[in-house]
Amino acid sequence: MIKLRLKRYGKKREVSYRIVAMRSTSRRDGRPLEELGFYNPRTDETRLNVPAIVKRLQDGAQPTETVRNILQKAKVFEQVNA
């Protein structure tokens, strides 16, 4: 199963995340199938590749709870259903 989840990177205590598509059995920081966006919790900055995310969701990828919340804020699910 493909999951949309966060991949951690950055310095200690200055963490940022990449939103990636990965197999559910992969390690957290393993090689992703595709990088779909960026999330910085310290500044609440988010950059998303919306067409690629919509395609992955339509193909059956399951977002984790945190990624689901980020996508709901960006109103990505409205584009999936349209």
Swiss-Prot record:
GO biological process, one term: translation
Keyword vocabulary terms for this entry: Ribonucleoprotein, Ribosomal protein
Gene Ontology molecular functions: structural constituent of ribosome
Gene Ontology CC terms: cytoplasm; small ribosomal subunit
Entry-linked PANTHER family: 30S RIBOSOMAL PROTEIN S16, SMALL RIBOSOMAL SUBUNIT PROTEIN BS16M
Entry-linked HAMAP family: Ribosomal_bS16
UniProt family annotation: Belongs to the bacterial ribosomal protein bS16 family.
Protein name, per record: Small ribosomal subunit protein bS16
